Amino acid sequence: MKMKKKSIFISLLIIGVTILSACGPSYEEAQRMSKAERLKRWREDSLALKIGVTPTLDCLPLYLAEAEGLFDTAQADIRLKRFQAQIDVAEALRKGRIEGCVTDLVRTRRLAKQGFGIHYFETTNAYWQLVSNRLSRVKNIKQLNDKMLAMTRYSAPALLADYAIDSVKLNRDNVFLIQINDVDLRLRMLLNNEMDAMLLTEPQATAARLYKHKVLMDSREKGLQLGVIAFSTQGTKDQRRKKQIEVFAKGYKAACDSLNKNGIKHYAQLLKTIYKLDNKTLNALPDMTFGYGNTPRQKDVNAADKWLNK
């Protein structure tokens, strides 16, 4: 009797497995479905207008537009592609992985000199501060002699580092320029006392000031406006792309208007989510105005070109 029950149980088990196998997709079918889904997503992504952004405050209008649904998704698929370093943003733009980005004038002028077509959409409110480690006892730029200064190559921070060194006639060979591309890593190295000085933009500069690190120079004092939003001319020349940029422009303007009306701290939760800010840093952020309708000034283009041609 026990043997008969056992035989019935095994038979039912085999039937169940057979039914499940017949109903469920085979491994090969699952692979084909997965490949088809990946292809679908790739096609959607390739058709979308992709904008490179970093965890810096010049990108805040884009983050707000995305979070608040200010980009008209019925008319255009606009996607933000997140990076930790501007050098990676520039490379993605060069390789056609993104159509536009929030970046700086030095990087885009360098791309243009390499024959890459650049269309300037907007200037941004980005600025950079040269900050020294309070434990390094560097109180002024002259004391950077034999010190390590973190920056990133072929960029506004690199230009400003040279401006600082030249302003006090330091021997460049005696200031050690260290390439740290990741903006958050650069800040952590200052807070961990691994660097003597560095160029920082917001909100990283605010965090540095909160920890009593000293500001030696501010790019605004030099009269330079180096932050830009730029698009690849190659990736945006057809009518569909132009329509997407029009939709992007409307969303960007609406986000700037909201930020200017309400102030950035009104969007505290977004700032905490995107920039990983604690309350102390959030409350210490400076008031900022976000403009639109401006393209780079010729004097700033000339400054970038002159530095690149050195």
Region locations from a protein language model:
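Bacterial N-terminal signal peptides that target proteins for export
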Residues: 2-10
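C-terminal motif of bacterial Sec signal peptides marking the signal peptidase cleavage site
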Residues: 19-22
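Short, glycine-/small- and polar/acidic-enriched structural segments
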Residues: 26-171, 177-178, 189, 196-202, ...
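Soluble non-cytosolic domains of exported or imported proteins
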Residues: 56, 84-87, 102, 151, ...
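Pocket-lining segment of extracytoplasmic ligand-binding domains
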Residues: 105-107, 177-271
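Proline/Glycine/Serine-rich low-complexity intrinsically disordered segments
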Residues: 135-142, 165-167, 173-175, 187, ...
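Secondary-structure end/capping motifs
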Residues: 238-310
